[in-house]
Amino acid sequence: MTTIEPPPAEQIKKDIAQIQQWLTATPHLPSVEDEDWLETIHRNCKFRLEKTKSKLDAYFSLKGKHPAILRDRDPLAPALVTARSAVTLAVAEQLTTDGSLLVYHIHQPDHSLLNAADYYKRIVMLHDVILLERLAPNGVLFIVDFTHFRYQHFLKIMMHVRALVEILVSCYAEKIKAAYLITESELVVQMIKLITKLSPQKMRERVKLHGTSMSKMPREVDEEVLSNDLGGKGPSLAHSEEKTQQLLEKYRDWFLEQDRICENLAKRSKKELKESFKKLEID
């Protein structure tokens, strides 16, 4: 991946001040005092002012459009605790040799525990924490295990999936290096085809189907970082999942505060509403 040389520190500071002024001057958007958070988003947007503004607009605006995923985000809420048992969602504690962050999604056998909105809510919360902690300096690499995925999972997972894609593409700008999907199920393959149709072409090109044999995974990722549950030498998935939950809980107050920060639709023009989110882009 080509390294983006950041502008001089003074220029970044001016950019952040301009973004804050823009937020304050835009009637339907809230003011934001957290300069570090804004700088991280700006960095992920490769220091492009207009792209940063677009991501921020979507970030606050989509809360009203998709409240099932973007509101009531208490990591200790009973529903989100149950979601931990449905899908093991975890980040590796160590970066790969090229500075990428491994993010695991391991679907568990008991489909009765799965609620798509709660699972997607935790995904988006994790993306926020990745931003806040600056965990992915060189992008994100997903490993999604569908070994236990069945038709009952499929029926649930497709609920809200269009909303999730819109949120991730419109609001977040982490570099997605690749998504390894562990499966030998034709059902999963067809589901992925449906989902990727909603995604930009660049994202589709980064989806890699991987069989259930883990023999090649350490060579394709980073053996030292990859979980020992998947053939690597890194910590167990259970250990990484617990650490990830602790990270989410660390920002519990922040998540609760964010519930009160969203756009004011009454102050947004009808033309803006009509033209918003027509174009989805990904780096």
Task: Show where each model-derived region lies.
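Basic, amphipathic alpha-helical/coil surface patches used to engage anionic, phosphate-bearing ligands
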Residues: 1-283
